[in-house]
């Protein structure tokens, strides 16, 4: 291949993976690399790179770094994954009488958008901050069941909860309702998560409608059980399991 050179890049869709790939490539390129986001996405890469010796700047939605910097070894502790915590949080929110506490969860603000959505849906949530790990905040979550209500998730909500949308769909099958728009990126994950999610929840007896950039779950029908194909996608597998509980 040819030598890499720095670029100024604005991703056409909000994608932390694309942003991270460009930044990491920029370390091996000549000159400066700048990634400018129209919508903020998870920022683990920007927080982690300085721990490994990389100098970068962040301002007004732009992340800049100079190529040729060498990474240095570091000992780090990885916080508990917020997306994995979301499954237990949804289970607690869905089942009457539930009261679940999760410790040492990563509370990076770009990863916990699902918590405010759960609260809007009716869950009762308490957050206790702990000692940060490096530049990553951590803490404990307490989630209790509450009366579930209809939830509207729009384009502004999606980047902070993109991976948790399938399990939030599962929550809506337990009551309330859910409408998601502006989430076309779901079609380009490990599977077409919109089509596969809708098909799977329908297979379990759910009242679900597919849209070009989202879906709608009408919580007016109790699931009857059935077969749901997760299409080899772990997030869909977790969503279908959560829909089936209770």
Task: Name each region found by the language model.
Residues 1-246:
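Structural preference for solvent-exposed beta-strand-turn elements
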């Amino acid at each position: 291949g040819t030598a890499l050179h720095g670029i100024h890049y604005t991703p056409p869709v909000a994608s932390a993976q694309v942003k991270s790939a460009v930044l990491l490539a920029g370390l091996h390129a000549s000159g400066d690399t700048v990634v400018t986001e129209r919508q903020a996405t998870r920022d683990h890469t920007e927080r982690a790179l300085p721990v490994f010796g990389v100098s970068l700047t962040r301002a007004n939605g732009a992340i800049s770094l100079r190529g040729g910097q060498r990474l240095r070894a570091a000992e780090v502790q990885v916080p508990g994954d917020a997306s994995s915590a979301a499954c237990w949080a949804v289970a607690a929110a869905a089942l009457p009488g539930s009261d679940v506490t999760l410790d040492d969860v990563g509370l990076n603000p770009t990863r916990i958008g699902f918590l405010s959505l759960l609260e809007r849906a009716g869950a009762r949530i308490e957050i206790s901050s702990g000692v940060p790990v490096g530049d990553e905040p951590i803490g404990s979550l307490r989630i209790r069941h509450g009366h579930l209500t209809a939830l509207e998730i729009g384009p502004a909500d999606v980047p902070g909860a993109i991976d948790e949308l399938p399990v939030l769909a599962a929550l809506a099958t337990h009551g309330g309702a859910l409408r998601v728009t502006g989430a076309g990126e779901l079609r380009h994950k490990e599977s077409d998560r919109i089509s596969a999610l809708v098909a799977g929840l329908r297979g379990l007896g759910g009242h679900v409608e597919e849209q070009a950039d989202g879906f709608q779950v009408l919580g007016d029908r109790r699931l009857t059980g059935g077969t749901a194909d997760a299409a080899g996608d772990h997030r869909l597998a977790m969503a279908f399991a959560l829909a089936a509980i209770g």
